[in-house]
Structure formats: C-alpha cells, structure tokens
Amino acid sequence: MKDRLAELLDLSKQYDQQFPDGDDEFDSPHEDIVFETDHILESLYRDIRDIQDENQLLVADVKRLGKQNARFLTSMRRLSSIKRDTNSIAKAIKARGEVIHCKLRAMKELSEAAEAQHGPHSAVARISRAQYNALTLTFQRAMHDYNQAEMKQRDNCKIRIQRQLEIMGKEVSGDQIEDMFEQGKWDVFSENLLADVKGARAALNEIESRHRELLRLESRIRDVHELFLQMAVLVEKQADTLNVIELNVQKTVDYTGQAKAQVRKAVQYEEKNPCRTLCCFCCPCLK
C-alpha cells in the first residue's frame, strides 16, 4: 500500500494558490443576507417594545376606568369630579388605542414586505409575524375589557336613575327606563310634583343629570366604534394567519425528522468511507 498523503497535501496547496479567496466568495452571500436584515431586526425590536409598552399602559387605563366607574354608585364625592376623571381616562384610552392600531398596521405591512423580500421562513418574517399576532391579541383583549367597562357604566347610570325614580314614588322597570332614555322625555315625572317638595325636585334633577351622563357615554362609545370595526377585520385575518402558522409548525416537524434520517445516513457513509481505510494502512504504526 503506497502512502499518498504527500500528494494530497501538494494538491491542497496548488488549489489554495489557484483559488485563494474561494471560501470567502462561497460564504459571502450568507454574510450579506445576515447584514442586510440586521438593521431591519433592530428596528422591528424597537417597534415591538414600543407596542408592548403602549399595551401595558392601555391595560392599566382600562383598569382605572373600571375602578372609577365602580365608584359611581358608592362614592360620596361630587359626581361632577368623578365624571371629569372618567371622561379624561376614556379620552386617553381612545387616543392610545388609535396609536396602537396604527403601529400594528405598520407591523403587518412590514411582515408582509419581509415575507415577500426574504421569504416566509426568514428570521425577520417569522419574528414580525409571531409578534404581530401576540400584540394584536393583547390589544384585542384590552379593548374588549374597555367595552365591558363602558357597558357596565351605562347600567350603573340606569340603576341610579331607577333609584331616584323610586324616591319620587315612581315604580318603573329597566325596559321603561331604556325607552325613556331613547325618547329623552324625562319631564313626564314633574307633572304631579308639588312646589314645596324639594326632595322630589332634587331627584328629578339627578335623573336629568344621569341622562346627560348617558348621552356622553353613548358619544364616547360612538367615537371608538370605528376602531372596534377595524379590530373585527384584524380578528378575521388573524384566524387565517394562525392556520398558516400551524401548518408551518407541522412542516417543521416533518423536516426535522427527515434531517435526523439524513444525519444518520451521513454517519454511516462516513464510517464506510474507503479513505478512512486508506489512511489506516498508511499509518506508520502498521509498518
């Protein structure tokens, strides 16, 4: 058996002299891809952190609104101060919700652009798609809680009106209050009031005040109605996205199984490689 290790080393030196930058040229496309997406990922991470912070502030504002509305029936403070605080929190929630919705829409566009430019399995496309779904879900939950808080405040106003009507000696049901609210005819309760009955007059004033509060509440709900419609569209689109993600995960599991099989075959081929036997015969210990 002839030792040809020296010939192999000579051929390797000749190849290095002919192609001194061959390895660099081979690896450069991968390096270019990494460097090309680095700045996109940094910008994406900043946007994700911003939306996460905004979502946390939105959730905190919604909780504050719920607590403020709960004080509407039990607090001894002047109702005017409670209403000012409630209106201020509601305006902040509406403004913050619009900002978050715009940022989520921009992230959705970035995800689609990254998928078209770098492929659906690229890092920037997968990260932006997954974070968009998670942040959108958090935003949807916060806005749902906000809607529940406003609906509960509406019920609180109706309960307070019903209490004041009982003070005036008027027994009405919730449906009757709803009808009166829609028609705005609260003066029907002043027909039999005596001039010297200050308590009844105060109760009527309280009812009219609650009616105005309900009108303001309806106005706030109308302001965010368009935002809720846009969120409904996002929910429908997100369902399709989740189905695609589930399919990609299943494909990844299949590819992983195939890769393991290929690795086992490669190990077997390496063990059966005739070059390994040649090197063993060329070893000085066999001389």
Swiss-Prot record:
Keywords: Coiled coil, Familial hemophagocytic lymphohistiocytosis, Golgi apparatus, Membrane, Protein transport, Transport. Pfam families: Syntaxin. Residues 41-71 form a coiled coil. InterPro entries: SNARE, Syntaxin, Syntaxin/epimorphin_CS, Syntaxin11_SNARE, Syntaxin_N, T_SNARE_dom. Residues 204-266 form the t-SNARE coiled-coil homology domain. It is a peripheral membrane protein. GO terms for biological process: exocytosis; intracellular protein transport; membrane fusion; synaptic vesicle fusion to presynaptic active zone membrane; vesicle docking. Its main location: membrane. The keyword Oxidoreductase does not apply. It is found in: Membrane; Golgi apparatus, trans-Golgi network membrane. PROSITE patterns: SYNTAXIN, T_SNARE. GO terms for cellular component: endomembrane system; Golgi apparatus; plasma membrane; presynaptic active zone membrane; SNARE complex. One of its GO terms (molecular function) is SNARE binding. Interacts with the SNARE proteins SNAP-23 and VAMP. PANTHER family: SYNTAXIN, SYNTAXIN-11. SNARE that acts to regulate protein transport between late endosomes and the trans-Golgi network. Belongs to the syntaxin family. It is linked to Hemophagocytic lymphohistiocytosis, familial, 4: A rare disorder characterized by immune dysregulation with hypercytokinemia, defective function of natural killer cell, and massive infiltration of several organs by activated lymphocytes and macrophages. The clinical features of the disease include fever, hepatosplenomegaly, cytopenia, and less frequently neurological abnormalities ranging from irritability and hypotonia to seizures, cranial nerve deficits and ataxia. This is Syntaxin-11. The gene is STX11.
